[in-house]
Design a protein with these regions (language model features):
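Substrate-binding cleft of secreted/luminal carbohydrate-active enzymes
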Residues: 359, 381-460, 518
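Aromatic-lined carbohydrate-binding/catalytic grooves of carbohydrate-active enzymes
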Residues: 175-217, 514-546
Length: 628
C-alpha cells in the first residue's frame, strides 16, 4: 500500500544559509524530478539555510501551476535560526494531476519575496514506471580495466568539450538524470586496506584541493563540464562521492566522504543541475558485505546504518533539500530485511541493480523488487531501478546488451518510479558525436533505444496507455540436428559438422546474446540413429565425444534458456504417430530422454511433459554472476 498525502516539517539541527558564496539559501527539490506517472506521489522538498542574522522569520508557501488561493498546496510561518537549517517536506498525490505541471515555491522574508519553480510532467498510467530510461551512470573513467576494456582508452582522451557533447547526447534520448560514478579513483576493498583520511592515495577527476593525485585523462575538469552542460538543458546531476574503498562504510570512510562532499558542494553547489549526493561504494543486497561470521556480518550492517545516519545529517547542514542515493545489488535481500528499515530512515533513494541475473536459491528479480518496494514504502524512501544495459563477454569485459532485453526489463519491472541505466559511456553512443566511446554496436543500441522511446512518446500523445512497445521480438528457435533433405542445404550444410559439441555450445551462446529464451529441438533421432546417448539406437555422432543434445542442454543451463525436447523421429520425418509401433517408439524416446536429462529440470519445480507437439519443456534457473 503506497503512502497517502502527508505533510511534514523537519527542522534539522545543522549548520548552514539565505545567501553565501553564490549559493542561494533557498532550494526547491522534487523527488523524482521531471516526469512521473500518476501512480507515484511527488515528494516536494524545500531547504532553507540562514547565513546571516541569528533568527529569520519566513512565510513559506507551495503552489501548483499558479500563485492563487485555490492552488495552495502548503503554507507555514517558520523561524529559521542561524546554524539550524530548515527542511520542509510535502507529499503530493498525483492521480488527478495528469499533464505538465509547475510546482511554485514562494518565500517571504519581510518585504523581500523569493520565487522558485520546478516543472513536473505527470503521465496517465496504471503502473508506477514510465517504462523509459530516465537517466544513466557516467564513469569519467571506468573503475575496472577488465570491464572497461572496450572504452577506457576512449574515455581517457575525451576533452571537456566532448564531455559536454556526451551530456547533450544523453539529453537527446531523455536520460536527464546523470549519476557521476565517482570523483576519485581508488581500487580498494573494505577490510583489505588500512587507509586513513590522511594517507588516502586516490586520484581525483577534478581539481581537488584535498588530495594531490589526479587521473591521467585529457579533460581538465569533466565534473564542471558535465554540470555546466546539464544546467543548459534542465538536467539533474547526482554527484558521485567516492571512491574511498568498495563496500566501505567504516568511520574512516565516513570522515573521508564528509570532506569530499563539502568540497564538491563548495566548488559546484552553485550549479542548478547539482541534484544530490550519490555514495559510490555500493553494497550487497544483504548489507553485510558477504562476511563469513555472524559477528562480522553484524558489524558491516551496523557500519552502513551509522554511515548514512551521520552522512545525511552532515549533508543537510550544507544542502538540506538535496537527496542522498546508494546503489545496492538485488541479491540476498532477505538477509538484510531487518536492517533496511534503519538504513532507509536516512537514505532518500535506494537504486538497486542486478535483477536480471539473480543467483540460484535466491528470490526472483521480480520478488526482490517487490520486497524492496515495500521496505521503501514503509520508510518513506524512494526506490529507483539501476537497469544494467550491458552483458559480460567471456573475458569479463562489458558490451552493450541487446535492445530487446532492455525493453523486456523496462516492461517487466513496472514498480520503479525512476529507471536509470548503467551506464551511458561505452554502452550507448550518439552517431553524431565527434568521438565514439567503445564498439560499433554502442551506436546500434543508442539508435534502437531512440526508436523505442519515440514509440512510447507517440503512444502517450495518442492517449495509449502502457502498450508493450517492442518489435515483437523472436523469443526462440528450432534446432535441426540431422541433414534430411535439400531444405537443409543452407541450414545444415554438408561441410559443417552439426554433431560437434563445440559447434552447439557456441550457437547457444549466440542465441542467448541476441535475447532468445526458448530452444526447440526438432528431432533427437533420425533413421534409427540417435543424437543423444541412446541405449537402443545407434549413435549419429562419434561415440568418443559428447552428444550434440548433451552439449545443447549444458549450454542452455549456462545461459538460463528453456528447451523443448523432441521425442522423434521414430524413423524419419514421415512418422505417422497413429501407427502403434511409431507411437510406442516415440514414447520410448521420450522416456529415455526424460531419464537422461532430468537433472536439467528445476529441482524446486519439476516440469511434467507437455502433450502439445509431443514435446516437453525443461526449465531451469539462470546461472549468473554476483557482482555488477
Amino acid at each position: 500500500m503506497y503512502k497517502k498525502t502527508t505533510l511534514g516539517l523537519i527542522i534539522c539541527l545543522l549548520s548552514c544559509s539565505l545567501w553565501a558564496k553564490g549559493k542561494a539559501g533557498i532550494d526547491l527539490t522534487l523527488i523524482p524530478p521531471a516526469t512521473i506517472t500518476n501512480q507515484v506521489d511527488l515528494d516536494i522538498r524545500v531547504g532553507i539555510t540562514n547565513y546571516d542574522i541569528s533568527v529569520r522569520s519566513l512565510d513559506v508557501s507551495l503552489y501548483l501551476n499558479k500563485i492563487d488561493r485555490n492552488t495552495l498546496l502548503y503554507h507555514s510561518t517558520c523561524q529559521v535560526e542561524k546554524d539550524n537549517p530548515l527542511t520542509i517536506r510535502y507529499n503530493m498525490q498525483t492521480r488527478d494531476k495528469v499533464g505538465k505541471n509547475k510546482i511554485i515555491l514562494v518565500v517571504k522574508d519581510g518585504t523581500k519575496k523569493t520565487i522558485q519553480t520546478r516543472d513536473i510532467e505527470i503521465i496517465d498510467s496504471n503502473i508506477r514506471s514510465t517504462r523509459l530510461i530516465d537517466g544513466a551512470w557516467t564513469s569519467i573513467y571506468h573503475w575496472s580495466e577488465t570491464e572497461g576494456k572496450h572504452w577506457n582508452n576512449d574515455l581517457r582522451r575525451m576533452t571537456d568539450d566532448q564531455w559536454r557533447e556526451m551530456i547533450r547526447s544523453m539529453h537527446k534520448v531523455g536520460m536527464d538524470i546523470i549519476v557521476i560514478q565517482e570523483v576519485f579513483r581508488n581500487e580498494q576493498y573494505v577490510g583489505k586496506h588500512d587507509i586513513t583520511v590522511e594517507t588516502y592515495q586516490g586520484k581525483a577527476f577534478y581539481p581537488s584541493d584535498l588530495y594531490e593525485g589526479r587521473m591521467e585523462i585529457a579533460a581538465k575538469d569533466p565534473v564542471e563540464a558535465i554540470l555546466a552542460e546539464a544546467d543548459k538543458h534542465g538536467m539533474h546531476v547526482m554527484m558521485g562521492v567516492g571512491m574511498f574503498a568498495w563496500f566501505d562504510f567504516t568511520p574512516e570512510s565516513l570522515e573521508w566522504h564528509k570532506r569530499v562532499a563539502k568540497e564538491l558542494w563548495d566548488k559546484y553547489g552553485h550549479h542548478p543541475s547539482f541534484y544530490g549526493f550519490y555514495v559510490s561504494e555500493e553494497s550487497g543486497g544483504g548489507l553485510d558485505n558477504w562476511e563469513k561470521t555472524p559477528e562480522k556480518r553484524q558489524i558491516r550492517k551496523n557500519d552502513i546504518v551509522n554511515f548514512f545516519a551521520e552522512f545525511k545529517k552532515f549533508c543537510n547542514r550544507m544542502a538540506p533539500a538535496k537527496p542522498i542515493m546508494l546503489a545496492t545489488n538485488s541479491m540476498d535481500v532477505p538477509n538484510g530485511k531487518e536492517t533496511y528499515p534503519e538504513l532507509l530512515k536516512n537514505l532518500d533513494i535506494l537504486c538497486p541493480f542486478g535483477f536480471a541475473r539473480m543467483p540460484e536459491n535466491d528470490l526472483t528479480g521480480k520478488q526482490a523488487a517487490t520486497m524492496l518496494q515495500k521496505l521503501c514504502n514503509d520508510a518513506g524512501s524512494h526506490l529507483w531501478f539501476d537497469l544494467e544495459a550491458f552483458l559480460f563477454n567471456e573475458d569479463q569485459s562489458l558490451y552493450p546488451r541487446p535492445i530487446e532485453q532492455i525493453i523486456h526489463d523496462l516492461n517487466l519491472f513496472d514498480n520503479f518510479e525512476k529507471i536509470l541505466c548503467y551506464q551511458f559511456p561505452g554502452v550507448f553512443n550518439d552517431p553524431k558525436m565527434s568521438i565514439r566511446v567503445g564498439e560499433k554496436r554502442t551506436v546500434d543500441l543508442f539508435e534502437g533505444y531512440q526508436k523505442y522511446r519515440e514509440r512510447i512518446l507517440y503512444n502517450r500523445k495518442a492517449g495509449i496507455k502502457n502498450e508493450i512497445v517492442s518489435t515483437k521480438t523472436v523469443q526462440g528457435t528450432w534446432l535441426n540436428l540431422p541433414y534430411q533433405d535439400v531444405r537443409n542445404k543452407y541450414m545444415n550444410p554438408f561441410h559443417v559438422d552439426c554433431t560437434a559439441p563445440a559447434f552447439w555450445k557456441q550457437k547457444i551462446k549466440e542465441y542467448s546474446d541476441i535475447g532468445l529464451e526458448y530452444l526447440v529441438i526438432m528431432a533427437v533421432a533420425n533413421e534409427r540413429q540417435a543424437y543423444y546417448p541412446s541405449s537402443f539406437m545407434k549413435y549419429a555422432y562419434p561415440s568418443n565425444r559428447q552428444s550434440p543434445v548433451e552439449a545443447i542442454m549444458e549450454a542452455a543451463d549456462q545461459y538460463g534458456m528453456k528447451v523443448f525436447m523432441s521425442c522423434g523421429w521414430a524413423v524419419n520425418q514421415d512418422d505417422n504417430i497413429r501407427e502403434p509401433a511409431i507411437k510406442e517408439l516415440q514414447q520410448k524416446i521420450m522416456k529415455e530422454t526424460a531419464d537422461l536429462f532430468k537433472e536439467h529440470i528445476n529441482p524446486e519445480k519439476p516440469d511434467v511433459p507437455l502433450n502439445k507437439n509431443d514435446a516437453f519443456q525443461k526449465v531451469q534457473k539462470r546461472h549468473v554472476q554476483e557482482k555488477r
